[in-house]
Amino acid sequence: MSWPLIGAYALLAFVAIIALNVTYQFLFRLLNKTRPPLVFHWIPFIGSTIHYGMDPYGFFFSCREKYGDIFTFILLGRPTTVYLGTQGNEFILNGKLKDVNAEEVYSPLTTPVFGSDVVYDCPNSKLIEQKKFIKFGLSQTALEAHVPLIEKEVEDYLAMSPNFHGTSGEVDITAAMAEITIFTAGSALQGEEVRSKLTTEFAVLYHDLDKGFTPINFMLPWAPLPHNKKRDAAHARMRAIYIDIINKRRNAGDNVPEKLDMIGNLMQCTYKNGQPLPDKEIAHIMITLLMAGQHSSSSISSWIMLRLASQPAVVEELYQEQLANLERTGPNNSLAPLQYKDFDNLPLHQNVIRETLRLNSSIHSLMRKVKNPLPVPGTPYVIPTSHVLLSAPGVTALSDEYFPNAMAWDPHRWETQAPKENDKDDIVDYGYGAISKGTSSPYLPFGAGRHRCIGEKFAYLNLAVIVATMVRHLRFSNLDGQTGVPATDYSSLFSGPMKPARIRWERRAAKSG
């Protein structure tokens, strides 16, 4: 058989497949009574993957106009049912363990990076205990102790980094904030031993581990691809480093002072069954904290600086807020070092963070595997076990229905639109302390339900100290000819600004203004 003939048959087969797919969708729409509407697509398996992957929020909003808040699309061959709005967030993120499962969705991707027996590679009951261990490592006392550590890291970086050499210049702020946030998290959470390695071997290991979050790994997490081989080698080496740190601390015994960092906390933890937290699991939890927290902190801090550069007047408002509300007991009547209590007197700082999180959350989709057929209250729909559920809390955060002129960055909106206060019915204890379910709110930057981020307080504190410190020392503005902020890059599992994202900076003549 000649190649032209083979090509002709292949083309005919392709056309036939598309025709059958379109026919199936037509019949599905005509005859279906209990499934959510299916988003139209030409090519089987691919479905709506490209549109969703390139612009998830554009995809969500366009589908909502056509199909309503509940619809199903094909994501790499997997029927994925989206339920938008606060009711959708409640339905998916507060689903019962027997009905929805996060582990089956995320474990293939996260386990090679984070390690075994933690997060999504263990029963939910064990994960709840691990979250409790971490939460108590983020106590009020620990958070207060973190403030001077974070401030020092930022000041040292601004003083010594080539990115901020001289009195003014330009900087790729995404690269700078990636370095700053890994240093601040390293110093505050990881301990001095890890922090001392962040500029050398750890930086390479972090980079190689980070490649494990490549989107293709949702489909092929164990494929012998070059980036996966580097990921596995980096994980093994990073685990060995943590275990070595733990062993040295144990061997030092009473000769080492009690530490407020997370490693010191985890070394004292014991499961309910009496088993001490194994060193391997301590190492894997520490890797998880480093990798998971760094992405969101790096992304959102970059967005904050880009937003401030696009509105330099807000930078000056922040600086004046510090001058008006904080002690000036430093040299030459300059601002005193930051303390935890200071941020109660800096509402605009908090609102800048809150507003940037609203517009630029780094995770646009939260998924759960359906384990039992799920009737959707108030609808005729029943979601089958072959589907994955997708919640997109960012959709309500970007909706004019909840936030007038929602696409505008306006930190002052929070002066009159405070976050919804939790009522008694919204409080739940999943096993690691009472928290808000959060799902009734249109603003969920840290997720909701049993998988809500427990590092929320540290994240806010870390960002607040970084912003306050940088505003004390620098002014920001866009480069000549640039307006607004860069577009969002959705090519990674964790979205962020398109790179490079350059802004102009200028040192203040004196801290006291």
Swiss-Prot record:
Its EC number is 1.14.14.154. Pfam families: p450. Gene3D superfamilies: Cytochrome P450 (1.10.630.10). Coiled coil: none annotated. GO terms for molecular function: heme binding; iron ion binding; monooxygenase activity; oxidoreductase activity, acting on paired donors, with incorporation or reduction of molecular oxygen. PROSITE patterns: CYTOCHROME_P450. It is a single-pass membrane protein. Pathway: Steroid biosynthesis; sterol biosynthesis. The keyword Ubl conjugation does not apply. It is found in: Membrane. Heme binds at residue 453. CDD domains: CYP51-like. The chain crosses the membrane at residues 3-23. GO terms for cellular component: membrane. Its cofactor is heme. It catalyses: a 14alpha-methyl steroid + 3 reduced [NADPH--hemoprotein reductase] + 3 O2 = a Delta(14) steroid + formate + 3 oxidized [NADPH--hemoprotein reductase] + 4 H2O + 4 H(+); a 14alpha-methyl steroid + reduced [NADPH--hemoprotein reductase] + O2 = a 14alpha-hydroxymethyl steroid + oxidized [NADPH--hemoprotein reductase] + H2O + H(+); a 14alpha-hydroxymethyl steroid + reduced [NADPH--hemoprotein reductase] + O2 = a 14alpha-formyl steroid + oxidized [NADPH--hemoprotein reductase] + 2 H2O + H(+); a 14alpha-formyl steroid + reduced [NADPH--hemoprotein reductase] + O2 = a Delta(14) steroid + formate + oxidized [NADPH--hemoprotein reductase] + H2O + 2 H(+). One of its GO terms (biological process) is sterol biosynthetic process. Keywords: Heme, Iron, Lipid biosynthesis, Lipid metabolism, Membrane, Metal-binding, Monooxygenase, Oxidoreductase, Steroid biosynthesis, Steroid metabolism, Sterol biosynthesis, Sterol metabolism, Transmembrane, Transmembrane helix. Belongs to the cytochrome P450 family. Sterol 14-alpha demethylase; part of the gene cluster that mediates the biosynthesis of the tetrahydropyranyl antifungal agent restricticin that acts as an inhibitor of CYP51 and blocks the ergosterol biosynthesis. Sterol 14-alpha-demethylase plays a critical role in the biosynthesis of ergosterol, the major sterol component in fungal membranes that participates in a variety of functions. Rtsn2 acts as a self-resistant CYP51 that contains mutations found in CYP51s isolated from azole resistance strains and that is not inhibited by the final product of the cluster, restricticin. This is Sterol 14-alpha demethylase rstn2. The gene is rstn2.
